[in-house]
Amino acid sequence: MAVNPLDFLKNMSNFKDNIDNIKKEISQIVVCGRAGSDVVVVEMNGEFVVKKILIKEDFFNDLDNEALEHMIKSAFNDAVFKVKEEIKSKTMGSIPFGI
């Protein structure tokens, strides 16, 4: 079976369009990582940039530094996990063979 080089180039163009669409979708992802029953919430975009950190005021004074650091770290890690899951769900059908 002969492979037509023009078909290959056409497919490469479609692949590039798919990649561009995926990049656009990823840039629009926004997730919230949470810790301590929403005492700490980290908002992160699809490029893993933290956009916001919210700490419930009524708990802020009651937490020691170590507990607060732990909750921020947990919320951040939760957000990273959620971004990765969103990226995976948006890209698995768009990239051939699940690459």
UniProtKB/Swiss-Prot annotation:
GO cellular component, one term: bacterial nucleoid
Protein's name according to its UniProt entry: Nucleoid-associated protein EbfC
HAMAP family reported in the protein's UniProt record: DNA_YbaB_EbfC
Function field: Binds to DNA and alters its conformation. May be involved in regulation of gene expression, nucleoid organization and DNA protection.
Native organism: Borrelia duttonii (strain Ly)
GO MF annotations in UniProt: DNA binding
Keyword annotations: Cytoplasm, DNA-binding
Quaternary data: Homodimer.
Family the entry assigns: Belongs to the YbaB/EbfC family.
